[in-house]
C-alpha cells in the first residue's frame, strides 16, 4: 500500500470539490499493480489500524450478494432470471406480482412505485419504516405490499431496497428447493466465493432477520475492509466464467446492446444490480462514449471500475456521489482509449 498523496494526480482523488473532507473516511485508487490509499479518518482523528478498519456495505450488498447470487446460480440454472417471484415468495400473493420475475427485482423494474418522477424511492421506504421491520414475517409483508402497481414490469427504474429483500427471499427459497431446507444461499453459495478470493472474515456473515428463519438480507448489511474491496474489484475486472457472459457481464457493461434502465437519461443507468455512468468520449480522448460500471452505497460510497483496469473507491457519509475527477485522472495516467 502506498500513500495516495505520493501520486502526481493526488488532488483528483478524494477531491474536496467532490466530497467534503470532514465526511470522508477513506478513499483509494488501484492503478493495476499498486494500491494507493488515504489515511482512515474518524470523527475523533485518524484511525491507526487502517488495514483492519471495517467499512459498511450499505447498498454495495445489492451488487455483491444479489447480483452475485444470480450470476452463480445462472451457471446451473440458465433460466433463473425468468423465474416468477410468486413461485418462490408466497407472501407476494397479490395480483400485482403476477408477472414479476427475478430479473425485474434485480433491475428495480417491478412496475410498482410511489411516483414515476423518482428513480430512487428509498426515502419513501425510510418514511414508512422499512428498516424497522426486523423479523422476516414483518419485513416480507411490508415489502410485498408497500408499493402499488403503476406500469408493466421491466420498463421503469424505481430503486427500492425492499425489492432486493423480496429477491433475496425468492433466491434463498429457490436455492432451498434444489438443495434442501437447511441450505442457505449466503453460507453455501456466496461465502465459498469470498473464501476463494481470500477475503477477510468480516465478509463471512451478512445481516439477517431476527427470528428462527434468519433470512439473509441482500439489500445491505455487509462489512468489509479496503483490501476486500480491492480483491472483489479485481475479480470483477478479470476475465472469468462469471464476468464473460450473463448476469454479471451485463452488470459490468460488457454487453454494448444491454446498457440497463436509465436513471438520468444519457448519464446514469442501472443494470442487474450495478450502476453505470456514461461519459462523453470526446472528453476522454475516445472515439465513442465510455460507460463506467460502479457500485454505490448510502451515505456516499462509490466503487468504480475503469476501462483501463484501474479502480477508485471512497467511503463517506454526507450523501456526496461525485467522482468525475478521478475518472479523468485515471485516464491521464493510463489512457482508456488508444489515440488515433
Where in the sequence are the language-model features?
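Penicillin-binding protein/beta-lactamase superfamily catalytic region
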Residues: 138-157, 173-181, 203-309, 314-321
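Non-transmembrane alpha-helical segments in soluble domains
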Residues: 103-106, 168-172, 190, 194, ...
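A short, well-structured edge-of-sheet supersecondary motif
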Residues: 4-49, 302-305
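Catalytic-site signature segments of enzymes, centered on catalytic residues
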Residues: 46-54, 126-208, 220
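Active-site SXXK
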Residues: 56-80, 105, 167-171, 229-232, ...
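Active-site helix/loop module of the DD-peptidase/beta-lactamase fold
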Residues: 75-113, 146-148, 176-219, 241-242
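Short, gly/Ser/Thr-rich active-site loops of penicillin-recognizing serine hydrolases
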Residues: 325-340
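Solvent-exposed, acidic/flexible segments
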Residues: 54-63, 67, 78, 95-99, ...
